């Protein structure tokens, strides 16, 4: 009989311990959760202002009325390097049709980014997110990640990973103003 009571006590203690750990984990997880909401298709793209390689400010809301091909990338990222020349070629096709590229480099030096842009002969605006605040606001992971923003400023599509030139042309057509 004493053994049965001891077993019940042990089982109850084990259950209470598991519940306590689950509660503590839930509280900790909620307290440390990312303060930014996950963005999705149909959401308004959060506004930001970043500076390009020429020192010129680019504010996302200034592009309202145009389609924006918002690309997050790094010079060390092989898929980014592969898609950049195709993005530049499509930029030449679509820039006069109301579609703009805004390429957001993630926290690298101006020197590294300028060298990369010169190496690939890129003509579209490249801005640097030195504090990673824009990357965090958009919950960017992995690189490259591209958001297609329609002329109304809403996210139309989120593309994670490398794109082909055919994909890029199709996506730019998709956000081209009527």
Identify the function of each model-found stretch.
Residues 47-68, 91:
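A short beta-strand-turn-helix
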Residues 64, 72-89:
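Conserved redox-active cysteine motifs that mediate thiol-disulfide chemistry
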Residues 115-123, 128-176:
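Thiol/disulfide oxidoreductase modules built on the thioredoxin-like
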